[in-house]
Swiss-Prot record:
It comes from Conus imperialis (Imperial cone). Probable neurotoxin that inhibits ion channels. Expressed by the venom duct. This is Conotoxin Im9.4. One of its GO terms (molecular function) is ion channel regulator activity. Keywords: Amidation, Disulfide bond, Ion channel impairing toxin, Neurotoxin, Secreted, Signal, Toxin.
Length: 92
């Protein structure tokens, strides 16, 4: 492999790790059951805990919540129906 290709590959890997969304295996989360010797996964449901990461604010965080819901609970994404039937931004 040429030096320029190797440098590009290393740079791409560094960017992948720096900007990626990784869930690692932490020690102590996978254990062996004392009764039957089976491996057990002690991690909580990762799908529920996963938070998306982005370099830029997503559109729903910039949503304009200046509309009224009239008690029907219908607001834009990123908003909720608050007091006075006004859509309010979620506390993110």
């Amino acid at each position: 492999m040429h030096r320029s290709l190797a440098g590009s590959a290393v740079l791409m890997l560094l960017l992948l790790f720096a900007l990626g969304n990784f869930v690692g295996v932490q020690p102590g989360l996978v254990t062996r059951d004392a009764d039957n010797g089976q491996l057990m996964d002690n991690r909580r449901n990762l799908r529920l805990e996963r938070k998306t990461m982005s370099l830029f604010k997503s559109l729903d965080k910039r949503a304009d919540c200046s509309t009224y819901c009239f008690g029907m609970g219908i607001c834009q994404s990123g908003c909720y129906c608050g007091p006075g039937h006004a859509c309010m931004p979620n506390g993110r």
